[in-house]
């Protein structure tokens, strides 16, 4: 309970940094059907991480009901490019889609205190609360590039 110690949290060797996943994984593959084309796919995954405010990893959500970890997640991205070198020297067209599967995920979180209740009414006393930072939704774009 950090409030019992004037907000101080005792962190020891071996404790994990908040919002930094213990494990991460990235896999990229590229397919080139011919010299002008390339198609790529990337999968990026992160394990769960502890929220800020739980630096000593002692906040147990099973005891107080307050979420103490940011869940792990995975995202799939696709990209493609066509090089017009045979007809328009230096010009390329490209397309990208990030978060192809439109996963709902969180990139970070914080345990803090608030004076706003779940129903958005004001509270006379501070209430422990957890907030999460949402990840980017699916997005896509197309572009034209000239390289010289």
Residue map of PLM features:
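Gram-negative outer-membrane beta-barrel transporters
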Residues: 1-55, 145-147
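Extracellular loop and loop/strand-boundary signature of outer-membrane beta-barrel proteins
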Residues: 10-16, 62-68, 127-132
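Surface-exposed coil/turn segments at beta-strand junctions on protein surfaces, enriched
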Residues: 20, 32-34, 71, 86, ...
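Residues that define the transmembrane beta-barrel architecture of outer-membrane proteins
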Residues: 21-25, 72-76, 136-140
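Active-site lining segments that contact anionic ligands and/or coordinate catalytic metals
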Residues: 34-38, 73-77, 88-92, 139
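C-terminal beta-signal and adjacent terminal beta-strands/loops
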Residues: 45-55, 82-148
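A contiguous binding-surface segment within folded domains or other stable secondary-structure elements
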Residues: 49-67
């Amino acid at each position: 309970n950090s409030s019992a110690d004037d907000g101080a949290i005792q962190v020891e060797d071996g404790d994990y940094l908040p919002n930094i996943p213990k494990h991460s994984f990235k896999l990229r593959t590229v397919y080139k059907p011919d010299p002008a084309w390339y198609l790529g796919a990337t999968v990026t995954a992160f394990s769960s991480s502890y929220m800020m405010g739980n630096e000593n990893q002692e906040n147990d959500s099973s005891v107080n009901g307050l979420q103490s970890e940011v869940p792990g997640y995975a995202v799939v991205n696709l990209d493609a490019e066509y090089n017009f070198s045979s007809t328009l020297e230096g010009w390329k067209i490209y397309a990208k889609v990030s978060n192809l599967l439109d996963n709902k995920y969180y990139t970070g979180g914080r345990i803090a205190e608030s004076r706003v209740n779940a129903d958005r009414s004001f509270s006379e006393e501070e209430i422990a609360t957890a907030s999460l930072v949402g990840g980017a939704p699916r997005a896509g774009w197309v572009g034209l590039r000239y390289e010289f």
